[in-house]
């Protein structure tokens, strides 16, 4: 997946004492003026093309330090390279943490790893205070308009409110060290543009655009009184907002896929099976025919990208893989045959750690609670299958 191959920007934090898992006075400067200054300094060098290419360098700093003294002691330059010094480097490759190095950043890119005593050579020097420098994190399954609000709020609140909350949450996401997100369905193009143009702060967004769903599928958010739909029936509110696009038949799937590509989708999202939160489709339902799925795969392939699908069951997973789908979202009900097929096709398995605990969603009806139980029980088994069959996994 494109987001998984991105060269990520560094993320800096201070290792916390064993057992310390919460913020305390002097222990963290998430969202501090120093962090904001550093983010603005690096983002100033980025063009829209660099952001889309995944080359932006965005920093987040955690520490027990006196923010005003550090900021005032390190004057800023308007532009130019950065040299990060006095740090420990974790590169995410499995190697041991490195000490005695510095990192040079030029034009928003990590230019080189240098010895600790490397000369600045025109770069602004930023003392990291002995903190750990690590790659920015990827959230591979993110919904711009659902990250901070409930589905009910998303379906009933004013559109402006929804997008303002999304922008606020994007900045919070960046401050947590997540520098790239793969949006897996919804109206994220405007926020992506605002971030790219420096209007608001947030991670790089790889948008999918509207979730493409069959009638009665997991992305069909219409009410019962909206049925039936005739040739002159207007689009539903969720379709107008770009949350979902309903398509039945190969021709409609082609059209809706191409519309999202026209708007700037990095990848395409289809609903290939039932869900827990949806009102109409059973969890074990299989959605879209193989030919419909193949239509989306072909259209995406013509633009050099791929299709991901929401699906849980072995039947749905295998149908999607036969159609050429490259990313399975969820898949907690997969069996060994489906897992083996994912490995054989070289597909990505984008798992989410759904659990039935005190933080899980609360559903009023028994049917959805039962679906939730099945998915939660399947989560541990799915991770075990992914490890056993050496399947490429995405996290989010």
Give names to the regions the model predicted.
Residues 71-75:
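Boundary at the C-terminal end of the N-terminal hydrophobic targeting segment
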Residues 76, 80-82, 89, 93-134:
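Histidine-rich, glycine-flanked metal-binding segment
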Residues 165-191, 202-211, 265-278, 306, ...:
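Divalent metal-dependent hydrolysis catalytic cores, especially in the metallo-beta-lactamase
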Residues 1-47, 57-65:
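N-terminal secretory signal peptides
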Residues 123-132, 191-199, 253-265, 334-348, ...:
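Short amphipathic alpha-helices and their capping/turn segments at secondary-structure boundaries
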Residues 20, 215, 271-384, 388-396:
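Active-site core of metal-dependent hydrolases
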Residues 187, 196-319:
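Histidine/acidic-residue-rich, glycine-tolerant segments that coordinate divalent metal ions
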Residues 131-197, 215-224, 291, 315, ...:
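Metal-associated gating/positioning segment near the N- to mid-region
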């Amino acid at each position: 997946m494109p987001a998984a191959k991105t060269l990520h920007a560094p993320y800096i934090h201070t290792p916390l004492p064993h057992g310390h898992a919460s913020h305390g006075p002097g222990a963290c400067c998430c969202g501090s003026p120093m962090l904001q200054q550093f983010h603005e300094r690096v983002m100033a060098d980025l063009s829209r093309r660099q952001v889309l290419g995944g080359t932006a360098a965005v920093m987040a700093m955690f520490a027990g330090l006196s923010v005003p003294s550090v900021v005032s002691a390190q004057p800023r330059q308007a532009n130019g390279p950065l040299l990060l010094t006095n740090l420990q480097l974790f590169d995410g490759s499995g190697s041991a943490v490195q000490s005695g190095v510095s990192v040079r950043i030029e034009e928003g890119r990590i230019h080189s790893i240098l010895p600790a005593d490397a000369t600045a050579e025109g770069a602004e020097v930023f003392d990291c205070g002995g903190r750990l420098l690590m790659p920015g994190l990827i959230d591979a399954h993110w919904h711009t308009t659902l990250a901070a609000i409930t589905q009910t709020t998303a379906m009933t609140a004013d559109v402006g409110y929804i997008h303002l909350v999304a922008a606020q949450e994007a900045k919070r996401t960046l401050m947590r060290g997540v520098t790239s997100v793969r949006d897996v369905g919804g109206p994220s193009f405007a926020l992506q543009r605002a971030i790219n143009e420096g209007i608001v702060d947030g991670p790089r967004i790889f948008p999918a655009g509207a979730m493409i769903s069959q009638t009665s599928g997991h992305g069909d958010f219409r009410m019962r009184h909206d049925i039936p739909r005739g040739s002159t029936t207007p689009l539903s509110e969720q379709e107008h907002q770009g949350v979902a696009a309903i398509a039945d038949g190969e021709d409609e799937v082609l059209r809706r896929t191409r519309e999202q590509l026209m708007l700037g989708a990095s990848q395409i999202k289809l609903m290939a099976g039932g869900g827990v939160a949806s009102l109409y489709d059973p969890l074990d339902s299989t959605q879209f025919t193989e030919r419909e799925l193949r239509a989306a795969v072909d259209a995406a392939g013509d633009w050099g990208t791929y299709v991901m699908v929401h699906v849980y069951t072995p039947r749905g997973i295998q149908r999607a893989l036969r159609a050429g789908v490259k990313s399975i979202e969820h898949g907690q009900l997969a069996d060994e045959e489906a897992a083996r097929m994912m490995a054989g096709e070289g597909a990505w398995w984008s798992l989410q750690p759904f659990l039935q605990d005190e933080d899980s969603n609360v559903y009023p009806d028994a049917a959805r609670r039962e679906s939730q139980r099945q998915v939660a029980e399947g989560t541990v088994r799915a991770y075990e299958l992914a490890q056993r069959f050496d399947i490429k996994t995405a996290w989010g």
